[in-house]
Amino acid sequence: MSHKTKPSTQERKAGKPSAPKRKVISKSPNSKLKTIVKGQKNTAVKAQTSKPLHPRNVHNKGYDFPALIAAFAALKSFVKPNPYGNLSIDFADPQAVKMLNAALLKLHYDVEHWDIPAGFLCPPIPGRADYIHYVADLLAVKKSSKKRVPKGPRVKVLDIGTGANVIYPLLGIQSYGWSFVGSDVDPLSIANAQQVFASNPAIAARFNSRLQTNAKHVFHGVIEPNERFDITLCNPPFHASLAEASEGTARKLKNLAANRAKSSEAKPLRSTKPVVTKTETPLNFGGQKAELWCEGGELQFLQTMISESHEFASQCLWFTTLVSKKENLKPAKALLAKVKAEEVKEMEMHQGNKITRVLAWTFLKPEQRELWAQYRDVEN
C-alpha cells in the first residue's frame, strides 16, 4: 500500500515613447499571469487551476514516505500515522522537517548530503521547486511546435540571499543543470552553502558563492563587470524588525497548535484505500536576522532591488523575486515603470489556499531577448 501525503496549504502555501502593444498568452495551467507592457493597461490572463503545483513539479503527487524512508533511513523515526491514518511527521519539530527535506533532496534530486545549522530556515521544498519551474518558463523558447526550457550550465542564475539551506541552487542544478551564483550577507550562510556543495562533488562545479559585504545593496558588490545572468532569484526578508518577525512566528505557532488540536479530535477515515490528505502545517519557524527581516521590510528591499536592477539592465535577461505581501506589488510596479522596465510579469502560484507571487521584469526588448538566447546557445 502506498502512503502519500500532499504538502499542506502553508507549505505550498514612464517618460519613454510608448512601445507597440504586444499580446501575452499564459500557457501555465496553475498560475494567473499578469503582464504589463509600456503603452498598455494592466491585463490579466486567467487560467483554470488543475493542480496545486507546477506541472513539472515532482511533488504534485505528495509525499511517498515509504520511498523517502528507503532513500534516507534517518527519516524513519520521525514518521508515524496522523489522526487520519496517513503517514506523516510532526511539522512543528525542526529536526523532523530537516530530515524530511534531506530525504526529499536525496530521493528526487540526488543530493547525497544536506544539512543546515540549528536556528536557520528550513524551507518547504515543494513550494521552492515551484519558483524554479515558473521562472524556467520565462526562458522557454519555441523549438518546432513546442516551447523548450533551456538546460545545462550555459544557463546562469543568480540567487540573491541563497541562505544556509542553498535550496534554489540545488533544485535548479538538479532539475535543469543550470549554473548558479549564490550571494548572502551572512558569512555563516555562505560557509554552510559551500559545505553543502563540497559534500556533493558531482554538482560542486555548478555553484559559486559570494559574500555581500554591504547589506544596503542587492546587486552592487555581487554582479561583476561584463558578467551576464539569464535569471536572478530572490526570496526577500519580509519583516521590518525583529519584533515584527517574532510576532509573525508566534501567530503561526498559535495557528499550528489550533490546527493540531482540531486534527486530534477528527475521526479517522474508514477506508481500505490510501487516502491523500492535508497534513499539519509544514513550517519550521527558525531563521536568522538576514533571513527574516531587514530595515524597511520587504517593500524597502524590493525598491532597492528594482533601483539597482536598472544599473545592470544589459547584464541580466530576467530579474525575478518573490513578493509575500500583496500590498507591496503596486508600489513595486510603479517603480518599475519609473525605471522604464520593458516588460513586467506577475505570476501567482496557487499552492492550496496560499498564493505566492513572483514578480519578474526585463529591460530588454523581445528581439534583444531572442538574440540573447541565440548567443547563449552558440556560445556554449
Curated annotation (Swiss-Prot):
Pfam family, one: Methyltransf_10
Record GO terms (molecular function): 23S rRNA (adenine(1618)-N(6))-methyltransferase activity
Keywords tagged on the record: Cytoplasm, Methyltransferase, rRNA processing, S-adenosyl-L-methionine, Transferase
EC id: 2.1.1.181
Gene3D superfamilies: Vaccinia Virus protein VP39
GO annotation (BP), single: rRNA base methylation
Chain segments carrying region Disordered: 1-32
Keyword presence, GTP-binding: no
Alphabetical list of SUPFAM superfamilies matching this protein: S-adenosyl-L-methionine-dependent methyltransferases
Cellular localisation: Cytoplasm
Catalysed reaction equations from the record: adenosine(1618) in 23S rRNA + S-adenosyl-L-methionine = N(6)-methyladenosine(1618) in 23S rRNA + S-adenosyl-L-homocysteine + H(+)
Cross-referenced HAMAP family: 23SrRNA_methyltr_F (MF_01848)
Role, per record: Specifically methylates the adenine in position 1618 of 23S rRNA.
Family, per entry: Belongs to the methyltransferase superfamily. METTL16/RlmF family.
Protein name from the UniProt record: Ribosomal RNA large subunit methyltransferase F
Taxonomic placement: Bacteria, Pseudomonadati, Pseudomonadota, Gammaproteobacteria, Alteromonadales
Encoding gene per record: rlmF
